[in-house]
Amino acid sequence: MNRILVVEDEVDLAVTFDRLLRRQGYRVVTAASRAEGLKAIESAPPALVIADLRLPDGDGHDIIRAAHARNPQVPVIVVTAFASRAARDAALASGASAFLAKPFPASALLRLVHDELERSTH
């Protein structure tokens, strides 16, 4: 099954994403910071990344760039509480394939994960 990297500094959300995705059969790796996310990308490139834009030690845009440096086709879903049009446009310009504003229903995330993985393998 596909390996998904979740880069999220809010512990409760990271745990929720992890459980939700594992229940769907995905292998999940979580990272609570930019540094942990970058290390996870280098050690074993994921099939999909879910990343927050605001991280305690830097910018989620670095996660997008690093993921694409390893695999230009890897889908990156940005999840953020900063839901302005400017934040969305900046994330998409950095290479994010999708953008979700917190809070969002679990079904929206699962649909995006499924759709992005399907798209990246075809």
Predicted feature locations:
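Conserved acidic carboxylate
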Residues: E8
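Short amphipathic alpha-helix used as the core "switch/output" element in two-component signaling
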Residues: K39, H61-Q73
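Alpha4 helix (beta4-alpha4-beta5 surface) of REC/receiver domains from two-component response regulators
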Residues: D62, A83-L100, R111
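Two-component/phosphorelay signaling modules centered on CheY-like receiver
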Residues: V11-V29, E116
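The feature encodes the CheY-like receiver
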Residues: A14, P56, S84
